[in-house]
Amino acid sequence: MRIGGYRLRQHLKMLAPMFALLLVVWALRWIIGSLGTPGWLLQVMSITAATPVAVLLAVLVIHSRRFGGYVNVVVSSFLLNFWAESLVVAAIAFSVLTGISNVYAVPEFSVTGPDPMHLRHIRAHLTFSIGIGTLAGAAMGCLLLFLLRRLVPAKPAEESPAINRWKP
């Protein structure tokens, strides 16, 4: 199956550094939260804030390597948001299964009301967070790609050696 002229594997390969960035932010937030650091530091290490940054980085890669167009931006936004929310859900599930609290399952970052198994919290991450994050990231990314194409035209295909690496 091709999406915007490229296979899913090619999208995943292109997004690998952004996946790694999100994984590092997720792990650092978990570690910092376990150490009992101040709340402002937890807010700095936010996977919710890192995901749009990863989408913008993906758009820069898409533009500089001529890796498709707006469809590829939307797919990249979805894949990055899905990865980020899957990491958060894994941390919440770990907390529920082991009984060890972590920053992702504390009440101030959870859905209000009685939910000892965090099912509503997990469901919210898998539905609303992925959906809204994908739409917001795609809108922001498509706007950036539009501006980049108007203001900074990419080099012709034959001049850039990095382009051939991403061809199907």
Located regions from the model:
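Juxtamembrane/disordered regions of integral membrane proteins
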Residues: 1-168
